[in-house]
């Protein structure tokens, strides 16, 4: 049995699998917009996606429960395995032409992925005017995080002329029934894990107590409705670099400050007020080890910070974001409430299976809004010869929350992908407009 045909889910993957529900599906998405060479380009793209998907091993993987009596500490886990009846036409769908890609994407993001099949979909949305089409990719977070989803999606794009990577050393796979002689070592490792988990848990608890005196906003809280709305904003990356070079910090600092300023504008326009408002933002951090031979699964931690929504000065907001991010980086991704994802590594599979409902209900206690960045290659991607011009990433929406923000940079543009509960945030377009206005405000402030 090779690693391409079966591999056990990493702890965080298993956690995402078991907190999934119809009201809060744990799939991430990406809406790619392509310039079309002809009115039939969308239909041709759907044919290409179906034909190429069969040749991407990761897209053939389904998730199946596995009970392992020979490994009690992994009892109740799950595995990725090649689906013997895989049919790409079950996953690639061509829709009727539309004039609003995001309106269609919002409705499609509402729908959970079918758990008995490889958990991904590609929805092709032809534009009504025939000059463009979009593809909405959906991947369950247990199948792929943002980085792996990018790799899988790139596998069905037009091939690029790139240097061949150096071969990686082959690693023997453990299989589903490991050597019994290894059990004593596994037990010692599990006991050590308990100690590390207690350290992380203490960090989470301390950080949570530190944040009790601050205030979020009712606009960021929502009872589950199962509805979704999406929006996208593109801004010039040169403008972001102009701000960074003037004020200092990183591109990510500037983008987080843009989100804080946009929230301030949006809340004030709604009449909700921003005095004393500083919502907790979770900033995910990848902990993948580079260039390993075996799939690692999701390896995430995160930084938790208060967004300075209450501050009326845009440059001061940016300075406060820089200070908070520098403090988080100095402490490392294993400290604070953002490290809660690391606890998944120290919970046995049965804990994820039965504790998932409790974990998803506790999300609002840890953070108020997710702000995540998804790296994209600077190379121009094409599908059927049609160039990819825009990419809007979509993050899963945590239970109890109304809004999530994902950010990518591609070909000189920054793309903000917004996912919201459609009933709680009927004015998502106003928040999208506030993002553009905030970039303009920062650029103007730096010119003074």
Question: What residue ranges belong to the model's regions?
Answer:
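Soluble acyl-CoA-dependent acyltransferase catalytic core bearing the H(X)4D motif
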Residues: 1-12, 29-401, 405-448
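TRNA-binding/sensing appendages of the translation machinery
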Residues: 21-28
